[in-house]
Swiss-Prot record:
It catalyses: RNA(n) + a ribonucleoside 5'-triphosphate = RNA(n+1) + diphosphate. Residues 397-597 form the RdRp catalytic domain. This is RNA-directed RNA polymerase. Residues 845-878 are annotated as: Disordered. GTP binds at residues 258-265. GO terms for biological process: viral genome replication. It is found in: Virion. Interacts with VP3 in the cytoplasm. It comes from the Viruses. The keyword Protease does not apply.
Length: 878
């Protein structure tokens, strides 16, 4: 290949393709492949400079708060429910757990978090297909314009982009932009102040996100009434035959554990994660039984407990590794708010069992606009194109913070602007209300207890919305919800649902109109039109006669790409297959060629250390690129095919078992979820592509109650006029009767709900709800309870967020070493820690919060040092 680059003939042909005149002594490789790019120096790569930037932009920096120091405890004493696990050979539950029930100290914070800041992949020759593409381009005597476009697009991506984790400057800029969305031109608004109630929002979500009962793969779930350790159920004898029923959500064990275990993974602290969650829920339960939330000492004990657990609301702010533009490398970096693992676990226990068991969307439910669990393959995209081509309009689809509208034969792709920043705690309260009343409900009876209802409605929203985060050693405010928390999807989907509800009430104006844009101000939800395609039906129909010979049109390798319509439908475009007679998906061209230029690496990080995994990853990467659309582009297809074959030969020559590597091939690819249930040897052929795109009947829906086939428009109008009826309202009343912290007549409200429950007639098919309550009465009760729940949420949030004033807090931070050059990147804020007692101290009279019956361990050297320092400072003030 080096001979090709150094030949004069090659220079002439390549230069002609790009309109570049030959230059004496200049190598073609220098023209097409840029030199190694060195990212610019990050101007905010120290805590003091970062703090100054945030202060200058009015961003709230919080007073540093202390963490309890971790101490070692016997696992069998902390988690007696899981004592059996320690007897199983191969089980990894540690004999001791490092728990935070010792004296309190300020945490030491890792300045650098993986992936490393400032590092970027620049022309990754081990994976990049550029040279192979250029080589293949040289073999074409008369290059067509489409082939030239392929080379141009790929080389432009290599020149203009880089894969990496951006900069602290980019992270800080993103934080300020999130604050502007939340508090700027259209500040966030609580839905209850706009006339919504939790029940009316739930009735909208019944249409846009119908859910079923909790479960996994047809396995029924246990009620939400237990602590996490009791969600692992042993059946049988550990010394003989046994099984373990696992009712905990799936988690990524390689991801960050978060506070209070900075620098460790969830897999390394899984025992601690369960232990902290257990203790939190048990303390909450004990206080609720004592009437916590009412005025008096019990209320103070609850707030004291929440203050002890403040770190559950403080995420670690990581940069998201992406393919960023080099021109905006300093200012554009996406953030990931990594929740503390106990917070992630407890919220996931509410959302994951329901959402993972709800494959309900536009493909299998009439009138449902949801794209949740939508797969563009197996005829999925063709169904959407048929929906677009149908003459009825306006109409809409929705997925998280993405809205798609067909209006006046124009396709609109609309995104919520900085989607997570638009979310308020009340929005998440409404989302939790929906999951509990529609998912965790058995024929109207709740499958949850008071503790879980109180946590979901009154505590969880304050843990992840408008909470706080750590970046470097700064504790700062988070505006909106933390990106990547266990409720991110449903919160964003709820926001988009409210936008569509207002659009329906306005009689569905054109998205280009000022009337449509006025929804932003009314709801306090910002959005923008990302893409619009006029004459969408005409453009889609033109794909049929223009389809070129290829894998799915004649069964041959393509010599010219077929045209596409870039719908931006969750990143997918449409093209046409003559063989199948349907529209099939290809990844949007820009995204496809950017992915070809810069790989993300092995998706499952636990496989990274496996010998031979790099070559196996190459096989998967190149074949996956072909599957998601590379098959339609001749040069990219050939380059990926040749590179995958070379990687296969390398594995075979080294004696690595190829089949073993590729058995779980979807875990190696960033596109893995797309191919769920598709089993091939990972060699792209005409037959495999046809099988992947062959239409199959959609999965049957799994819902707890029938979905209104009249669609969202009918429900929006019925709610406005008060004509809507919903038999699921009973579980909502039970929830609102139990999940409150301050309602003085809670007993009376609960009795009312039980009275309604007993009024249900014997006939299971009878419309008992119609007979017992009118909509107006229900909404009136829900409105009262919603306001009470909101009041409780404010107090909960105040306990979790230790900000002493409403003004921007501007403490002086000591200058520390630059994290790019520091030999020891671990630093702490050397300030005296403030000691805080927990609920058990209030109950027992002494000591910090630790498991009941456990003796206080001996203080560590660090704790002794901090205590002596505090004593000296106290004496000096006297």
């Amino acid at each position: 290949m080096s001979d090709v680059f150094n030949s004069p003939q090659a220079r002439t042909k390549i230069s002609a393709a790009f309109g570049i005149k030959p230059t004496a002594g200049q190598d073609v490789e220098e023209l097409l492949i840029p030199k190694v790019w060195v990212p610019p120096e990050d101007p905010l790569a120290s805590p003091s400079r970062l703090a100054k930037f945030l202060r200058e932009n009015g961003y709230k920096i919080l007073q540093p708060r202390s963490l309890p120091e971790n101490e070692e405890y016997e696992t069998d004493q902390i988690l007696p429910d899981l004592a059996w696990m320690r007897q199983i050979e191969g089980a990894v539950l540690k004999p001791t757990l490092s728990l935070h029930w010792g004296p309190r100290v300020l945490p030491k914070v890792l300045l650098n978090s993986p992936p490393e800041q400032g590092k970027a992949q620049c022309v990754p020759t081990r994976h990049c297909t550029t040279q192979a593409d250029i080589y293949l381009f040289l073999q074409v005597p008369e290059a067509t314009e489409s082939l030239k476009d392929e080379v141009t697009l790929l080389t432009q991506n290599i020149r203009d982009k880089a894969y990496g984790s951006g900069t602290y400057m980019g992270q800080a800029t993103r934080l300020v932009a999130m604050k502007e969305v939340a508090t700027g031109r259209n500040p966030n608004k609580d839905p209850l102040k706009l006339g919504y109630t939790f029940e009316s929002i739930a009735q909208l979500l019944d249409i846009t996100l119908p859910v079923g009962p909790p479960g996994e793969d047809d396995k029924p779930w246990v009620p939400l009434t237990r602590v996490p350790s009791r969600m692992l159920v042993l059946t049988g004898d550990v010394d003989g035959d046994f099984e373990v029923e696992d009712y905990l959500p799936k988690i990524n064990l390689k991801s960050s554990s978060g506070l209070p275990y900075v620098g460790r993974t969830k897999g390394e602290t899984i025992g601690e994660m369960i232990a902290i969650s257990n203790q939190f829920l048990r303390e909450l339960s004990a206080l609720l039984k004592q009437g916590a939330g009412t005025k008096g000492s019990n209320k103070k004990k609850l707030l004291s407990m929440l203050s002890d657990y403040w770190y559950l609301s403080c995420g670690l702010l990581f940069p998201k590794a992406e393919r960023y533009d080099k021109s905006t490398w300093l200012t554009k970096t996406r953030n990931i708010w990594s929740a503390p693992s106990p917070t992630h676990l407890m919220i996931s226990m509410i959302t994951w069992p329901v959402m993972s068991n709800s494959p309900n969307n536009v493909l299998n439910i009439e009138g449902c606009p949801s794209l949740y669990k939508f797969n563009p393959f197996r005829g999925g995209l063709n169904r959407i194109v048929e929906w677009i081509l149908a003459p009825e309009e306006p109409k809409a689809l929705v997925y998280a913070d993405n809205i798609y509208i067909v209006h006046s034969n124009t396709w609109y792709s609309i995104d919520l602007e900085k989607g997570e920043a638009n979310c308020t705690r009340q929005h998440m309260q409404a989302a939790m209300y929906y999951i509990l009343t529609r998912g965790w409900s058995d024929n109207g009876d709740p499958m949850f207890n008071q503790t879980w209802a109180s946590f979901a409605m009154n505590i969880a929203p304050a843990l992840v919305v408008d909470s706080s985060c750590l970046i470097m050693n700064l504790q700062i405010k988070s505006y909106g919800q933390g990106s990547g928390n266990a409720a991110t999807f449903i919160n964003n989907h709820l926001l988009s649902t409210l936008v569509l509800d207002q659009w329906n009430l306005m009689k569905q104006p054109n998205p280009d109109s000022e009337e449509f844009k006025s929804i932003e101000d009314k709801l306090g939800i910002n959005f923008k039109i990302e893409r619009s395609i006029d004459d969408i039906r005409g453009k889609l129909r033109q794909l049929v006669p223009l389809a070129q010979p290829g894998y799915l049109s004649g069964g041959v390798e393509p010599e010219q790409s077929s045209p596409t319509v870039e719908l931006d439908l969750l990143g997918w475009s449409a093209t046409y297959s003559k063989d199948l007679g349907i529209y099939v998906p290809v990844l949007d061209k820009e995204r496809l060629f950017c992915s070809a230029a810069y790989p993300k690496g092995v998706e499952n990080k636990s496989l990274k250390s496996k010998v031979g995994i790099e070559q196996a990853y190459k096989v998967v990467r190149y074949e996956a690129l072909r599957l998601v659309g590379g098959w339609n582009y001749p040069l990219l297809n050939k380059a990926c095919k040749n590179n995958a074959s070379a990687a296969r030969r390398h594995l075979e020559a080294k004696g690595f078992p190829l089949d073993e590597f590729l058995a779980e091939w979807s875990e190696l690819s960033e596109f893995g979820e797309t191919f769920e249930g598709f089993n091939i040897k990972l060699t792209v052929t005409r037959e495999n592509l046809a099988e992947l795109n062959k239409p199959v009947p959609p999965k049957p829906p799994n819902v707890n109650r029938p979905v209104n086939t009249g669609g969202l428009k009918a429900v929006s109008n019925a709610l406005k006029t008060g004509r809507y009826r919903n038999e699921a309202g009973l579980s909502g009343l039970v929830l609102l009767a139990t999940a409150r912290s301050r309602l003085q007549d809670a007993v009376k409200a609960k009795a009312e709900a039980e009275k309604l429950h007993k009024s249900k007639p014997d006939d299971p098919d009878a419309d008992w709800f119609e007979r017992s309550e009118t909509l107006s009465d229900l909404l009136e009760k829900a409105d009262v309870a919603s306001k009470v729940a909101h009041s409780a949420l404010v107090e909960t949030s105040d306990a979790l967020e230790a900000v002493q004033s409403s003004s921007v807090y501007t403490p002086k931070y000591p200058e520390v070493k630059n994290p790019q050059t520091a030999s020891n990147p671990v630093v702490g804020l050397h300030l005296p820690a403030k000691r805080a007692t927990g609920v058990q101290a209030a109950l027992l009279g002494a000591g910090t919060s630790r498991p009941m019956g456990m003796e206080a361990p001996t203080r560590s050297k660090n704790a002794v040092k901090m205590a002596k320092r505090a004593q000296r400072q106290k004496e000096s003030r006297q």
